[in-house]
Amino acid sequence: MRKVIIKENPSEEEIKELLDLAEKHGGVVTIFARCKVHYEGRAKSELGEGDRIIIIKPDGSFLIHQNKKREPVNWQPPGSKVTFKENSIISIRRRPYERLEVEIIEPYSLVVFLAEDYEELALTGSEAEMANLIFENPRVIEEGFKPIYREKPIRHGIVDVMGVDKDGNIVVLELKRRKADLHAVSQLKRYVDSLKEEYGENVRGILVAPSLTEGAKKLLEKEGLEFRKLEPPKKGNEKRSKQKTLDFFTP
């Protein structure tokens, strides 16, 4: 069987056949199409007609990209179930219940890639090393902090580190290896708001970086977020894991 199967302007029947083939053989599906998107879950949203890229992975991951920005405009996590019915691709997540439907108006192209990839990513770089340091010595954030997840997927992106504080509050850490700016604060706020929708108000957001701009500091104060100063550990400097943060800011 070919590694890559491409079908231009596929019919409804051809879309179903190729989706079934991809599911059977563990293929990655990429669809270029004009479509509408309907989401129902913790809230409801509608995305009007437009040209988009739809990606379906063997683990159930489902992503819809526009022609801008890095993040998908809509997505479902691994474990979701994908079906095709009456020219609509439907992805359902059971817990919590979320339903994402892509109504195909005009399919331009469908690609099935029978990819084989068994390697795991070996993370390197300052932010990954900052996360390692935090897991090795959570006190660099604060006494009683317990990190639980790293690179945790949520509705609006991927949280660098997520854990709980001594009072049982959820704590979201956004890590930056260089001076943090307004964008970093906005990103953290988006993650905190998303988790508050799911878990309630007991969610804290902490920006972790060597420093931050004056504008970022003001926005942190305005949004009720926090800052911890932490330098990225130098390679080979294992003693850094025992160093406690020098100062922190809590509005």
UniProtKB/Swiss-Prot annotation:
Record-level Gene Ontology MF annotations: DNA binding; identical protein binding; single-stranded DNA endodeoxyribonuclease activity
Enzyme Commission number(s) from the entry: 3.1.-.-
Coiled-coil residue spans: none
Main location (coarse class): cytoplasm
Tagged with keyword Nuclease: yes
Keyword annotations of the record: Cytoplasm, DNA-binding, Endonuclease, Hydrolase, Nuclease
Domain of life, source organism: Archaea
GO cellular component: cytoplasm
Region (Disordered): 230-251
Assembly, per entry: Homodimer. Interacts with PCNA.
Stored NCBIfam families: PRK04247.1
Protein name according to UniProt: Endonuclease NucS
Native organism taxonomy: Archaea, Methanobacteriati, Methanobacteriota, Thermococci, Thermococcales
